[in-house]
């Protein structure tokens, strides 16, 4: 996982040849990951998110205060845009500029009226999973999916590409098109128990959190 001093360089992997789907390894440092997790915890502190789902190991959607399953933001002035979306965009743009990649990296642009929603799903170790699916979000949006805590065994597949299976580590960000036209299938097949530095949140050793930021273009 990324460390708190940003000594591990970010790296971009193009997962699919036929659709926009990019994995950014080590996108967020441990300090940034902890900041995100602390904000999630603060915003859900008055809600009972500790109870296990009735059908273990079904993943649990974190419910925020006010009985909301998603956070909604307008503009860039929030920790999720600044640390996840902007960090990922900066890395993708740098990848194109420095390495002159022939693949067309797609990154969002933001204005003060940019709309963004954030949802968080918590997975149990080791059998937490999410069936393969297509998001079917047809509102001209892009997804930035951050993994926190224990790593996930993750699957992505495009309509014309081979299935890709990879270990989705804490601090990695997956950027992809969630539309029906893109038809990117993705899912979680299992969760790995990983080791973490002593200054990590205790929950990182018990769970995997999928933090999905959906940004309208």
Feature-to-residue mapping (PLM):
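Non-heme Fe(II) oxygenase metal-center motifs and adjacent flexible, charged/small-residue loops
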Residues: 1-217
């Amino acid at each position: 996982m990324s460390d708190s001093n940003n000594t591990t360089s970010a790296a971009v992997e193009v997962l699919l040849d036929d659709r926009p789907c990019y994995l950014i390894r080590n996108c967020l440092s441990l300090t940034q990951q902890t900041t995100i997790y602390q904000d999630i915890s603060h915003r859900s502190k008055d809600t009972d998110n500790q109870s296990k789902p009735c059908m273990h190991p079904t993943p649990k959607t974190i419910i925020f205060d006010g009985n909301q399953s998603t956070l909604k933001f307008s503009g860039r002035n929030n920790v999720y845009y600044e640390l996840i979306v902007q960090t990922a965009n900066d890395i993708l743009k740098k990848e194109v500029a420095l390495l002159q990649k022939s693949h067309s990296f797609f990154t969002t642009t933001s204005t003060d009226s940019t709309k963004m929603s954030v949802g968080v799903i918590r997975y149990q170790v080791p059998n937490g999973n999410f069936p393969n699916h297509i998001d079917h979000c047809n509102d001209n949006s892009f997804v930035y999916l951050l993994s926190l805590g224990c790593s996930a065994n993750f699957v992505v597949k495009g309509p014309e590409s081979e299935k890709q299976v990879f270990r989705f580590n804490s601090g990695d960000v997956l950027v992809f098109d969630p539309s029906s036209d893109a038809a990117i299938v993705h899912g979680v097949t299992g969760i790995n128990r990983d080791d973490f530095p002593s200054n990590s949140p205790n929950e990182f050793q018990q769970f995997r959190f999928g933090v999905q930021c959906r940004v309208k273009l």
